[in-house]
Amino acid sequence: MSQFYCREDELRKLNKRYAGDKFECIVIYGRRRVGKTALINEFCEDKPTIFFSALNTTGKENLEALSKSIMSFERPDMESAPEFRSYDAALDELTALSKEKRIVFVIDEYPYLAKAKPAISAMLQHIIDHKWTESKMYLILCGSSMSFMESQVLGKESPLYGRRTGQFKIEPLDYKETAVFHPNLSAEDNSLIYGITGGVPHYINKLDVRDSVDEALLDNFFDRSSYLYEEPGNLLKQELREPAIYNAIIKAIAEGASRMNDIKMKVGEENSVVSKYLKTLIDLGIAKKETPITEKPGKKTIYLLADNFFRFWYRFVPINMSAIDSGRIAKIYPHAVKQYLPDYMGLIFEKMCQDYLLYYSDSLPIELSEIGQWWGTDPKKKKQTQIDIVGTPVEGKDYIIGSCKYRNEKIGVDELDLIRDYASVFGKGNNYYYYIFSKGGFTDGLLQAQERGEVRLITLEDLYK
């Protein structure tokens, strides 16, 4: 299936701006493989387009590539295109082309161009202000380095600040959008595909699940010749200078280290070093910082892997590397991988349940402001309490408290008693609405509690309805 799938809303908005026939500067950004270029290609398919994909090389070589892109648009039959003497000359040619005719000019991988030619943002600012605002130019700046795009293109310090007319941060698909790729598979299989690929269309296609997730993993993931097996290493080499330390940090977090001190101990580096590398991983969208909902960042801050694909790879590949290399992984897969999938899916199921409440539930007892996890110390029992879901209200003091269980056994009334206790430890609400999500269903006793209006029960299958 096309990587463009589920991007209809973005395409509609891009086309609406194109129909206006006035200058546009659109910024499109998001992590690698998420489908940015596929979206742009779909948008440009029936439009006059100059598509320039910047190279991770010198300014001179990028000017040569830009010259070819412009000349192949102007004179598609010309075998060898002349090179513009300067970037100013190339931009002037684009100005001339867009005076009377609507033209889409795409700079893909814009951070590469800005690195090779640091003055390019100021040059674009000048030509936008003095020439392009009165033209029919439709400029698209696209990039995968999210920190660069947010600070050096969208940020207040950027020469381009205030010049954009629209921006799109292209996110991975959510769990329900991911399932559209495999409408005939079960809810369990689709949840696993989401947990493995993180909703990245390119990875969904490469995993290529047909009848069995297990079979697809063995053929297209746990195989040395497969694309997905090599992908994390290739991405890190492409983005980072010292992948070894980044590897160690990602592996530490994937194995359960979430606090700075725990990560530092596993990696064997000082806090200052780990902190610097973690910041880069956060900028790339691989890791993320989390704080208990309703609280400010501080001592309770933890680090998690934001990218499910990296999380899955680092959870299961390094520990099974010998079996993969020797071709024995199929023999040990049931007890080396499959039996741990429910545990691996725990955090992912929580995110699915949060997204269900935010985007897909038809009727909620409160209007949600935000949703997330909460953790803190129970002062009576002197131990940590963690609540899978806390939904905060737009106004008032009514909260949603939820529990998420990705396991095969039925959940009973004791889980409702437990989250009631958790709500009292949380202690910020006057009233609480309880939700329990379960892959394996519920006991008769808990179903009766739902009939009495004490709790709302939602199965994995319900998430996909």
Predicted regions, residues:
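A cross-kingdom feature that marks ATP-driven nucleic-acid transaction machinery
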Residues: 293, 302-465
